[in-house]
Design a protein with these regions (language model features):
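Conserved post-Walker A coupling segment in P-loop NTPases
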Residues: 24, 37-102, 113-129, 194-199
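Nucleotide-binding/hydrolysis machinery
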Residues: 4, 11, 18, 22-24, ...
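Amphipathic alpha-helical protein-protein interaction surfaces
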Residues: 31, 44-47, 141, 177
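Short, conserved clusters of charged catalytic residues that mark active-site
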Residues: 33-34, 104-107, 120, 163
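Loop/turn-to-beta-strand initiation segments
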Residues: 116-119, 135, 156-161
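Helical "lid/switch" subdomain of P-loop NTPase nucleotide-binding domains
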Residues: 62, 87-91, 96-99, 104-111, ...
Length: 200
């Protein structure tokens, strides 16, 4: 039975390595094999994951690997660095009808609501503005949130995977990123090596 389980494990890891290759990620090195094994292990828990690494190393692919191993639908991704703060907030939290000028008359569901029991991938988390750092920390602590303009709390059941190419430890020391949020995100730390370090 153990031998069969080991064969199945190797097969699933190889499937993930092929997935890396499909996305032009060099995936046959020992380092990437270890990452595939790590993705399998962390797929069975709901803890928050913080993925670090240079731009283009495949942080989003690692998130997809977690989803595949867990047998869950693909994640909902949002980049924290590409949107103005007010728009990013409404995308994450949603809003009630008439919450602000120009708001949809029927309101809007945000990513925390749309994700359900799935996975939210917060890319470029190091770009998150200070006010939203506070709000995200509260969501992770309480596992609930409020739509903009809302008074009724809503459950946040999704798993959060965050990614950055920045040195968040350094930014915590400098005071530009909240220490408490960093520790909430960094429950399972994953560092993806740069391409130049992936020897076959």
């Amino acid at each position: 039975v153990k031998e069969k389980a080991n064969r199945e494990l190797v097969q699933r890891i190889n499937e993930m390595l092929h997935l890396m290759e499909d996305y032009d990620i060099v995936g046959r090195s020992k380092a990437m094999h270890n990452l595939a094994e790590l993705a399998l292990r962390v797929s069975h828990v709901r803890s928050t994951v913080l993925i670090t690494g240079e731009s283009g190393v495949g942080k989003d692919v690692f998130c997809r690997m977690i989803c595949r191993f867990a047998g869950s639908p693909d994640y909902i991704k949002i980049s924290c660095g590409n949107l103005p703060e007010n728009l990013l907030e409404s995308e994450l939290f949603g809003y009630e009808a008439g919450a602000f000028t120009g708001a949809n008359r029927t309101g809007k569901r945000g990513i925390f609501e749309l994700a359900g029991d799935g996975v939210i991938f917060l890319d470029e988390i190091g770009e998150l503005p200070p006010q939203l750092q506070v709000k995200l920390l509260t969501v992770l602590q309480d596992r609930r949130f409020y739509r903009i303009g809302g008074t009724a709390p809503l459950p946040m059941n999704a798993r959060v995977v965050a990614a950055t190419n920045r040195d968040l430890k350094k930014e915590v020391a400098q005071g530009s990123f909240r220490r408490d949020l960093y520790y909430r995100l960094n429950v399972i730390p994953v560092h993806i090596p740069p391409l130049r370090e992936r020897t076959e």
